[in-house]
């Protein structure tokens, strides 16, 4: 239900019909002709998380998704171990289990709990505290709320999406918190308020980055603030996160980053996987999710759990696994699994270089160096002048722009002879020299373009 509520809200914002959304319930079969799917409750950061048993004429396949075993977790985060044991007794052909934490020793629980460190933060820092979380990690948000309830502080939720998700979760008893403790965003300047800031996975730290750059009209960070990163950084986002950490430190805020080796996300560690294998007793084991090295670690866990090495399937994206009459059949079929980029009315024909250029433009902007030359003598008639879009605000960075124009002029003069100019060297020189200069001054790498014109 929780997932459907979020999906429905997002679809309605895009004016997409939501008539065909169906809420599935754990432990009730979903039938598709001769096949069926049986959802079973598992513990994760999202309420009502389920794994799926796909019952086919060739055997049952169980896909875990993300999970942990934690006997202290209650509804709607509780794993139904009895149902897992029942599924195992019925016979499972293949278990597809997540791999992200397979190399970690022991169980994930209780290392996923952050209540103690949150309590310490609330006790130590009496001024304004900002918690950065991911809006889908409801269990972690509940942990933060649990500790806030021991204080007299008010809570502000930044962002309509996060506010809507939390209010709906409270109304449906997914989150337990007193709504009278919520305050309005207009009170964000109060010095002892607590602010929850959330970012979507596709746009990590976007809201916090806007605050750091002083684009937000309600919140301005200062030296007395404390910023807590209460969610693990998703793989591939480490560089972005590091930049955010540095920018917060430059402001002088208290910066608290929960170490990922001490405070784990809700993913199965090696003992969680061992227990799942023991309950399900699969004939074949298929490590999924995570990097390839994680899947290799998961394969080793399965072998230690007693599964024959030839029955552990380690595959690359696109490779096909085929079972016929309960037996693994060799398949050389490959399914294309590369990213497909949709560009306007076309799909799949956008090259990597185009995508890279767009990433640079979106993250660092563009700098255009414009110069006009005499067509005959190649002498400069006007410029060079620099224009920027999405890089810096020119009026506040006049010295930066003037120095860049000076460097561009030097490069043009160095590569100009009577009646001749080497535009290739000029372009490369301007790109390299200004690129280094801008990075040294701003830590940004904008796209740099030379636009030259000639007049009689």
Model-based region annotation:
Residues 1-187, 206-220, 239-242:
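His/Asp/Glu-rich metal-coordinating catalytic cores
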Residues 146, 150, 168-456:
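C-terminal regulatory/interaction regions
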